Amino acid sequence: MEWSESVFDGRRREMVEGLRRSGIMNARVLEAFLEVRRHLFFPESEREHAYDDAAWPIGHGQTISQPYTVAYMTSLLADRVPSGKVLEVGTGSGYQSAILDAMGYRVFTIERVAALYSEALGRFRRFALPVAAKLGDGSEGWPEEAPFNAVLVTAAAPKEPEALLRQLSDNGCLVIPLGGMDVQQMTVITRRGEVFLKERYHEFAFVPLIGREGWEEEQEQS
């Protein structure tokens, strides 16, 4: 089968319909998934898998999350914070950043793996995406750019990083998978002054958040 842009367009429409059937109802999220060409965030030799509803390895022990997972997290954020500054922890391929940008957010993103950071930065420049990217420990956030209206963490942490909570604006929210190394519960923490309200949702399986306020690298390997 020849994977032309028209074929990818059709697969992308099918993906969005699948998300709708799976319960993703936020119209802005669905529109962004229809707009952003997910296959351009895959290596050319693997683009045929871009619209499968599955996570896919992108090297260095990291993955691009399955479309449903990205849409679910983005919906939790968008339902609470319709606009403003968003910090993404774990740039990966850059796809989640592109989705947030398509929805009109001002996006900041941090990646700890230098090779992935370089690849994502190249995509942002190639597609003229106004995303601010930084190489570093995402569990510590980006204090120089704080406060953020929302923080979205694309890796699993044993507990909510205090630094990320402190970088939220009032009424801002942190979307993060919390739990063990194998299974985590998607969690939304909303800031109300100095009070942080926690809501728990479905279970997922994410790669671990490595960093000062996440897992240690030795724990990841054990």
Curated annotation (Swiss-Prot):
GO CC terms in record: cytoplasm
Listed EC numbers: 2.1.1.77
Enzyme class: transferase
Superkingdom in the source lineage: Bacteria
Record InterPro entries: PCMT, SAM-dependent_MTases_sf
Family indicated by similarity: Belongs to the methyltransferase superfamily. L-isoaspartyl/D-aspartyl protein methyltransferase family.
Protein name: Protein-L-isoaspartate O-methyltransferase
Organism expressing this protein natively: Chlorobium luteolum (strain DSM 273 / BCRC 81028 / 2530) (Pelodictyon luteolum)
Gene that encodes it: pcm
